[in-house]
A protein has these predicted regions:
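Conserved hydrophobic "DFG−1" position in protein kinase catalytic cores
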Residues: 36-37, 45, 120, 137
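Acidic, metal-coordinating catalytic segment for phosphate/diphosphate chemistry
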Residues: 2-35, 39
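A generic structural micro-feature
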Residues: 25-28, 55-58, 107-112
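Charged phosphate-binding loop/patch that engages nucleotide di/tri-phosphates or the phosphate backbone
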Residues: 153-175
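Unchanged
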Residues: 65-90, 99-153
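Conserved Nudix-box catalytic region and its N-terminal flanking loop in Nudix hydrolases
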Residues: 42-82
Length: 175
């Protein structure tokens, strides 16, 4: 895989790793997320509640910030377990880029995003909600037709995934 490249998207927000950390608006952050695809081709997404620091009451990806000193895989595993109660293995890295966005305090700041993807052999009933209003598999047509209020990062990333060869492969018979 090549080194991450810079991309610009508008309106993406971020939260701090913890209350004592410098907020992501003031530093570079590493963000590890995943997209699981079920047998119907539906995507596992999180509906954030009104208390979320990032994109309240919007739909987003499962995952979050990798803590200082934590490696990417451990950060993803921790975030997924905290949010869904799931243990994930065998995912493939689909997206690995540095994304510049507002509301960073400087144009020299950007977040490094990694998104892992894979087929899911779980259902909504297997999810143990640890964060947000709900985490469920969502019909991709709801993303395409705009009927879900997506967070800015999700609005930027998920349509690209749905148009990718990777999504086509994951939704083909035998995946």
């Amino acid at each position: 895989m090549t080194e991450p490249t810079a991309r610009t998207t508008t309106g993406v927000t971020a939260r701090s790793v913890d209350e004592d950390a410098t907020p992501c608006s003031e530093r570079n952050c590493r963000i590890a997320t995943m997209i699981l695809v079920d047998a119907r081709g539906w995507l596992l997404l999180q509906e954030r509640d009104e208390h979320a620091e990032v994109a309240p009451e919007m739909w987003g990806l499962v995952g979050g910030h990798v803590e200082d000193g934590e490696d990417w895989d451990d950060g993803l595993a921790r975030e997924v377990a905290e949010e869904t109660g799931l243990s994930v293995e065998g995912l493939e890295l689909w997206f690995d880029e540095v994304v510049q966005h507002s509301p960073k305090i400087s144009t020299h700041l950007a977040d490094h995003w990694r998104i892992w993807v894979g087929r899911a052999d779980v259902t909504d009933g297997d999810i143990v909600l640890g964060e947000g209003r709900q985490i469920v598999f969502v019909d991709p047509d709801r993303v395409r037709d705009g009927s879900l209020e997506l967070s800015p990062s999700t609005r930027y990333l998920v349509p690209r995934f749905l148009e990718s060869d990777t999504y086509a492969r994951l939704t083909s018979f035998g995946g």
